[in-house]
Amino acid sequence: MVYTASSLALAALEYFVGIPSHLRKPNELPVLTAVAMEVPDHLIDAFNVASLLESYGIPDCRLAGEGWSVGQRSLGLMVPSQVIRREMNILLNPAHPDMPHVQVAVSEPFFFDDRLV
């Protein structure tokens, strides 16, 4: 599974919250590579958020994502961010036959601002 976000800012935040707090130190944040990809819209499905409104839990989202991945209904699936619920992440299934349609548009170094720690 390739985890992407609808914006660079969301991708950075999603990554940042996964860094253990004891590793968040000035001048020690990781240098990453920001990659912008072009994916045809018709290859991305939107997740039915209403089905999870009651619980909106990580296990529920994972189960739904696993079902989508195994079924190979689409190359991509838009899912709500657990960090900012009004924003969307996009899961890409690298085993899907349409994966060759994904193009890398930009690839550049990404640095976290030390003021985040």
Regions found by a protein language model. Name each.
Residues 24-117:
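Active-site and NAD+-binding cores of ADP-ribose-processing enzymes
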Residues 1-29:
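Long, hydrophobic N-terminal alpha-helical segment
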